[in-house]
Amino acid sequence: VPVAAGLALALKLTNSDRLCVVVIGDGTLGEGVVYETLNIAAKWELPLLVVLENNLYAQSTHHSQTLGGDICARAEAFGIETVTADTWDPMSLIGKVQETVQAVRGSGRPRFLRIDTYRLNAHSKGDDDRSAAEVRSYWERDLLTRFAQEDSPLASRFQREAEERVAAAVVKAREAAEPEPLIPSAQAPSAPCRRWIRTEPGQNRRVVSAIQDALRRNMERDAR
C-alpha cells in the first residue's frame, strides 16, 4: 500500500491524468501501515484508488473476530469518499468501478472502493474451518453456478466450449516436449580451494565472544 501511494505521488508530480490502483483484502486492515497511507493519500490529495476485496475472512479467520466497526468508516475517517459494490451484481459493479475511476481522475483525490465477495475455496489446502452450509450457500449464489443452471442454448454452448478448451490444453501439455534450458546453469562454478588449514579443536563459548576474538585478531594483523 505505501508503494502505491508513492507511485500516486509520482503521477501527481508529473501532472499525469493517470491514477494508481491498489487491491487489498479485509485482513489487510489489521496492518497499521494501511492507515498511515490513507492519511498521506488524503493529506497530499493523491490520485490513489484503494480497492478492498471483502470476502469476510483473513485467511481462515472471520473478520468478526478481528475487525471492529465498519470497513468504509475507516477510510471516511480520513475524509476519503467510499463506494460499496459486490460481485453478485456484475453490471452494477462495472458501473461503480467506472464512476470511481473517473472520480479519481477528475479530482486527483483518493477514493476507497469496497467490493463484497466470497472465496468459494479454502485459502490454502487444509485450513478451511468454514461450515459446509455457509460455503454451499455462496456456491449456490455464485454467478457461474446460476448461469450453468440456466436451461438456455447460450449456457450449454459456453459449458461445452469451456470443456473442449480444457481438454485441448491437457492434450497439448501431455504432448509438449520438455523445454530446453535457456542457460546451462544458473550457478557460477566455485573457485578452487588454494590450501587447507588445520584448526585447533573448538571451545564451548558464546558466539558473541568468538566474534569479538575474531575481530580483535584481524585488527591486530591489519593496522587499517
Question: What spans do the regions from the language model cover?
Answer:
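Terminal amphipathic helices with adjacent charged low-complexity linkers/tails
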Residues: 164-196
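Glycine-rich ThDP/TPP pyrophosphate-binding loop and its adjacent helix/strand module
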Residues: 1-175
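Thiamine diphosphate
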Residues: 1-21, 184-224
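Alpha-helix initiation/capping motif
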Residues: 131, 142, 180, 184-185, ...
